[in-house]
Amino acid sequence: MAKKSAVAREVKRRKLVEANFQKRAELRKLAKSLSVSEEERERAREALNKMRRDTSPSRLHNRCLLTGRPRGYLRKFAISRICFRQMASMGDIPGVVKASW
């Protein structure tokens, strides 16, 4: 089980990213736009740099919904490989069966 503080930090980051996503996207669009003056682009880059680092989506890390484990994460099921194996063997995940050929 992951530390509660690490999971809480990740939840906090997700909220920050969600709250600032639109503003960040607009600033990035301005900074990359060639139709805007160089001064305007520079202001947009500075504004992006002044924003909190935790508002960037690249700071997010996928975690298991059940345990909070950051490694061995399976995107399709949003759980770690360990939880997946346990749940699959118990038949808790619909449509997942042990392979045999």
Swiss-Prot record:
Q: Does the keyword Transport apply?
A: no
Please give the superkingdom of this protein's source.
Answer: Bacteria
Q: Which GO terms describe its molecular function?
A: rRNA binding; structural constituent of ribosome
Record-linked Gene3D superfamilies: 1.10.287.1480
Per the UniProt entry, what are the Gene Ontology biological process annotations, in alphabetical order?
translation
Stored InterPro entries: Ribosomal_uS14, Ribosomal_uS14_bac/plastid, Ribosomal_uS14_CS
GO cellular component terms listed in the entry, alphabetical order: cytoplasm; small ribosomal subunit
The record ties this protein, via HAMAP family, to:
Ribosomal_uS14_1
Known function: Binds 16S rRNA, required for the assembly of 30S particles and may also be responsible for determining the conformation of the 16S rRNA at the A site.
Q: Report quaternary structure and partners.
A: Part of the 30S ribosomal subunit. Contacts proteins S3 and S10.
Protein family according to the UniProt entry:
Belongs to the universal ribosomal protein uS14 family.
Q: Which NCBIfam families match?
A: PRK08881.1
Q: What is this protein called?
A: Small ribosomal subunit protein uS14
